[in-house]
Amino acid sequence: MAENKKAVQRRIRAVKSTQQITKAMKMVDAAKLRRAQEKVQNARPYSRELAKTLGRLIQAGAGIDHPLLHRRTEGTPTVAYVLLTADRGLAGAFNINVIRKAHQALQKESRPTKLITIGRKGRDYFVKRKIQPVLEFVNLGDNITFALARSVLSKIVDLYLSGEVDEVRVIYTEFVNAVTQRPKEMQLLPIQPAQADGAHTHVEYIYEPSPERVLDTLVPRYAETMFYQLMLESKASEHGARMTAMGNATDNAEEMIAKLTLAYNRARQAAITREISEIVGGANALQG
């Protein structure tokens, strides 16, 4: 019985130690989530308005073309799938959900495909299954900046402009809130500009210095902005999922500690009762 009590005490100490870790991780990711969520909320309206502006300019300037807008029709196009995952685990179903979506997309795709991974978890998953990414990015950190997104995208654009890939699709996780994140897929290249609304359909624009120069600046900036937003969405989703997972783990640890404490108290009570019974039995034997 003494050994049983000691074993329960060891388990209580172990669970309490784990609970301290999960609680600390929850607090850290809660702070990171607030910063990431603010970035997402700031980026969304900018991306939306930039898409509308680009759509109006392209629709108004008929005949204007740009390499990032041009859809290649010759031959069988090669599609690059860009997968955004985390470098670390302990984030609930965040990684496996988006990886599953990427795996399904690759299996359903009838055209030749190439894989680009951002995050260690996605890379490791596909490398283990003999699918080697043509580009991989790991250890990018938690502070996603526009400069970082542009640096990553430039390497992807190089593949596109060189003709190695003809279409780029991104599989990422859309941030809804701390407990809800949705794996999604969108086409990044060639750019599909938003349709202009009726109020702007017949507006004539004056370009300075020229339509070509304006689009040469605006089109790459649009691609960079969209990719930056997707990276922010993914990072905010990661922090939200990890904060929720660590919160659940902390609560589960609390329940386990309560059950173990109850088991310990029962074992101690049983030991005390047995000792009292032995004392009473010994006293009765002496009196007899």
Swiss-Prot record:
GO terms for biological process: proton motive force-driven plasma membrane ATP synthesis. Keywords: ATP synthesis, Cell membrane, CF(1), Hydrogen ion transport, Ion transport, Membrane, Transport. Its main location: membrane. This is ATP synthase gamma chain. It is a peripheral membrane protein. The gene is atpG. The keyword Lyase does not apply. The keyword S-adenosyl-L-methionine does not apply. F-type ATPases have 2 components, CF(1) - the catalytic core - and CF(0) - the membrane proton channel. CF(1) has five subunits: alpha(3), beta(3), gamma(1), delta(1), epsilon(1). CF(0) has three main subunits: a, b and c. PROSITE patterns: ATPASE_GAMMA. GO terms for cellular component: plasma membrane; proton-transporting ATP synthase complex. One of its GO terms (molecular function) is proton-transporting ATP synthase activity, rotational mechanism. Produces ATP from ADP in the presence of a proton gradient across the membrane. The gamma chain is believed to be important in regulating ATPase activity and the flow of protons through the CF(0) complex. Pfam families: ATP-synt. It is found in: Cell membrane. InterPro entries: ATP_synth_F1_ATPase_gsu (IPR035968), ATP_synth_F1_gsu (IPR000131), ATP_synth_F1_gsu_CS (IPR023632). It comes from Symbiobacterium thermophilum (strain DSM 24528 / JCM 14929 / IAM 14863 / T). Belongs to the ATPase gamma chain family. Gene3D superfamilies: 3.40.1380.10, ATP synthase, gamma subunit, helix hairpin domain.
